[in-house]
Amino acid sequence: MPEPAKSAPAPKKGSKKAVTKTQKKGDKKRRKTRKESYSIYVYKVLKQVHPDTGISSKAMGIMNSFVNDIFERIAGEASRLAHYNKRSTITSREIQTAVRLLLPGELAKHAVSEGTKAVTKYTSSK
């Protein structure tokens, strides 16, 4: 009985090899879509606080989700405050009040002082 022809072994489940396609004459090379994240900023802050410490990609993903979540909460609360006061602009005052409402006690105080410091630095550099 003849043996069936052996084909190339099937790639293992979860294999990470990319399938490359040959380019035709008229095709343009596809660009990788940009994915925005806060990872470079999280990394810069980490190096300021703990210069000898690294961070895994999983931990960076968690930090990115955390920053996005806090941003959305503050923006939403600031928007609500502006709406309540019949204002069409979100100012630093709305942001500050939103931070005071969202963050607990000492954390809110530190966040407000750091935010005020950042705004002062920005306006003085103009």
Swiss-Prot record:
Cross-link annotation Glycyl lysine isopeptide (Lys-Gly) (interchain with G-Cter in ubiquitin), location: K121
Pfam families to which the protein is assigned, alphabetical: Histone
Cysteines engaged in disulfide bonds, as pairs: none
Modified positions (N6-acetyllysine) in chain numbering: K6, K13, K16, K21
Primary localization: nucleus
Basic residues: compositionally biased ranges: 13-34
Protein name listed in UniProt: Histone H2B 8
Lineage: Eukaryota, Metazoa, Chordata, Craniata, Vertebrata
Encoding gene, per UniProt annotation: H2B-VIII
